[in-house]
């Protein structure tokens, strides 16, 4: 089976960079897959697309060096199995509140006897290889999102779930339940302290810790803090910011001495 390079890298103690897809475009998926990210996540929760658009995005990612993973829309066993059959090599699952929900996530990603995943890998077999069944349970990576008060309360129970590879922090939803505003994960002390607590507990249980970051600069901060996977915003934000910067540069006075010379012909 094709190896899961981000899982191998995290097991070596190295931080991985993760891209994020929200626009529903296989072309943007292909571009992000060639941008240097260790993995790229197809966001089926808040992304502007459904499964029929997620499939060609996963196909596009499969032709790039990156590892294709997904954020499931919910902790729904059938949906998670479908996304794995489509070729996802990892699942980030939102709103995990307790151990039972974490066990449901893990069970959907593992074939018996470790779980309840139904056999029918389809694209997973094409992408992963003929020996997919033999290695899928050890290759697929699972992340439970910690972003609710109940999830915080039951954090240790969630982290103790057999087969769960790690937790993933959704900083905006986490900020909301802590009484803070979205986007304040680096400035509101309640968010700062809680993120540090979640990271420390993940390390205690020897689990991976991932987090969504608003930019590459924030990703660098999280990498130094010890996170194993840092998501460097999403392609919609990257496109918007680059477009705004290009317009601003075009309307700004050119630097002194950079005026184009007038051509006088051949």
What is each PLM-predicted segment?
Residues 1-266:
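Expand to "…catalyze enediolate/carbanion chemistry for C-C bond making/breaking, isomerization
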């Amino acid at each position: 089976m094709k190896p899961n390079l981000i899982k191998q890298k995290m097991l070596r103690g190295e931080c991985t960079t993760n891209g994020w897809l929200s626009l529903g475009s296989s072309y943007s998926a292909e571009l992000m897959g060639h941008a240097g990210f260790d993995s790229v996540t197809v966001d089926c929760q808040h992304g502007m697309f459904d499964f029929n658009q997620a499939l060609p995005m996963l196909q596009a990612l499969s032709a790039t060096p990156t590892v294709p993973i997904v954020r499931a829309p919910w902790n729904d066993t059938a949906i998670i199995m479908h996304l794995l059959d489509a070729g996802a090599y990892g699942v980030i699952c939102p709103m995990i509140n307790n151990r039972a929900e974490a066990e449901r996530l893990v069970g959907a990603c593992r074939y018996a006897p470790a779980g309840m995943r139904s056999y029918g890998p389809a694209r997973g077999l094409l992408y992963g290889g003929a020996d997919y069944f033999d290695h899928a349970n050890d290759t697929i990576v699972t992340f439970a999102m910690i972003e609710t008060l109940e999830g915080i309360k039951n954090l240790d129970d969630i982290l103790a779930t057999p087969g769960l590879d790690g937790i993933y922090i959704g900083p905006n939803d986490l900020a909301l339940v802590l009484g803070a505003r979205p986007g304040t994960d680096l400035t509101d002390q309640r968010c700062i302290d809680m993120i540090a607590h979640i990271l420390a507990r993940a390390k205690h249980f020897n689990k991976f810790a991932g987090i969504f970051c608003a930019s590459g600069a924030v990703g660098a901060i999280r990498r130094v803090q010890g996170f194993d996977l840092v998501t460097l915003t999403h392609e919609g934000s990257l496109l918007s910011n680059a477009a705004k910067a290009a317009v601003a540069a075009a309307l700004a006075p050119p630097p002194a001495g950079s005026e184009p010379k007038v051509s006088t012909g051949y």
